[in-house]
């Protein structure tokens, strides 16, 4: 698991000082004192973690903003799935805030991350209470919480969450693409034709 650490957090950020120390721990390409503000921007820009904090300073507009950038949501195959996945995260965060949930153990988060990356839905995941269960069962509960969170946030879902429920039954996009490719090969297609079939995956 330690070999797959791109984006992974070893622990939650405890404060802005903690965050800055982590950014500073990586090599900087600008060390000139006059260029330190630019060095910080570049340092944060090359701090490849799933969550990072950026700062927007526009004195002429009296704007001094801290922006939390989440890089957790991976790009989806289609726009409807993209909307569904972002809707899930918005709803899930709203649920956690409304219910005042505690943060999961970071080790469980990283184990889930590793398991999902390597095994997709064919694995076991840790739930928010530390219980270990089948990925599809854990994720079904998470989608339900996201739906509740969207209600808390007064955001109407016209059916995007159904795409995520369907995915629990049909498999991930990667599963479907692999199935299309393998079926094509079994039917005698060459690799290029089979690959095209695999890439023809679309939301129905």
Predicted regions and their residues:
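Intrinsically disordered, low-complexity N-terminal regions enriched in serine/proline/glycine
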Residues: 11-12, 18, 27, 125, ...
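Intrinsic-disorder-associated interaction segments
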Residues: 2-12, 37, 41, 132, ...
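Loop-rich catalytic cores of soluble enzymes, especially ATP-dependent carboxylate-amine ligases
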Residues: 1-74
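C-terminal regions of mature proteins
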Residues: 136-204
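Generic alpha-helical secondary structure signal
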Residues: 16-17, 23, 32, 99, ...
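Serine/threonine-rich low-complexity intrinsically disordered regions
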Residues: 5, 31-32, 38, 50, ...
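Substrate-recognition/cap regions that form aromatic- and gly/pro-loop-enriched pockets
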Residues: 72-165
């Amino acid at each position: 698991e330690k070999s797959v650490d791109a984006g992974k957090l070893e622990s939650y950020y405890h404060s802005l000082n903690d965050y800055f120390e982590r950014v500073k721990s990586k090599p900087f390409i600008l060390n000139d004192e006059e260029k330190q503000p630019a060095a910080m921007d570049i340092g944060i820009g090359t701090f490849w973690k799933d969550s990072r904090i950026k700062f927007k300073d526009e004195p002429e507009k009296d704007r001094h903003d801290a922006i939390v950038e989440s890089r957790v949501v991976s790009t989806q195959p289609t726009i409807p799935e993209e909307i569904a996945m972002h809707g899930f995260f918005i709803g899930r965060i709203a649920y956690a805030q409304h219910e005042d949930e505690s943060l999961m153990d970071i080790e469980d988060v990283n184990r889930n991350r590793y398991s999902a990356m390597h095994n997709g839905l064919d694995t076991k995941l840790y739930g928010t209470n530390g219980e270990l269960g089948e990925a599809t069962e854990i994720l079904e509960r998470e989608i339900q919480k996201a739906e509740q969170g969207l209600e808390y946030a007064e955001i109407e879902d016209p059916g995007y969450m159904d795409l995520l429920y369907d995915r629990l039954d049909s498999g991930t996009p990667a599963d479907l693409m692999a199935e299309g490719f393998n079926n094509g090969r079994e039917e005698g297609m060459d690799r290029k034709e089979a690959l095209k079939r695999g890439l023809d995956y679309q939301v129905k």
